[in-house]
Amino acid sequence: MSDLAVTGNVESHVTDPHRRKDFLDPTEMKAFLEAAKAGRQGVRDHLLFLMMYRHGLRCSEAVDLRIEDVSFDRATLWVKRLKGSNSGTHPIEGDELRAIRRYLGLRKDNLPWLFLSERQGRLSRFAINYLVDRTAEAAGLTNLHPHCLRHSCGYALADRGVDLRTIQEWLGHRSIEMTVRYTRISQRRFNGLWRG
């Protein structure tokens, strides 16, 4: 995996096993994405979760994606944000682009939606909730929710040292205050600040 590779050391803030996780650390994310491949619609599910993670998509933004939002020539994705957030164009990494091509190559329809249900309709938010639960269980993870993938994106970017303004734009936040939460990460960021 290249962009937003699942490497690094993000500390989990979850101590109560019954509390829903805010985000997945890199090891958990890798296990989650691998588990997604094993389902009946593994190609679709892996791509869905990879895109939700890398682009910080909400459920409703993921189900609203259309094939025309992907530019294969420019290797970009048009992300239409909801809830008054700022929309924008995101680059798509090579492995993600190949996964999109592979998934579309398996389809035999002319429907505009990027993600389809097994009944050939647009995938629903309810279906994504179910898929997250099933995939989490297969990966040995508990108390996940789809929004956890969006949070995981923010935390992963912050852990890589990406500045807050860039994370704000990537996630489409209107206010920087919404983005600040992602700086609550490992103390590793502070190592060596005064060495020199």
Residue ranges and their predicted role:
Residues 1-196:
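Conserved catalytic core of the tyrosine transesterase superfamily
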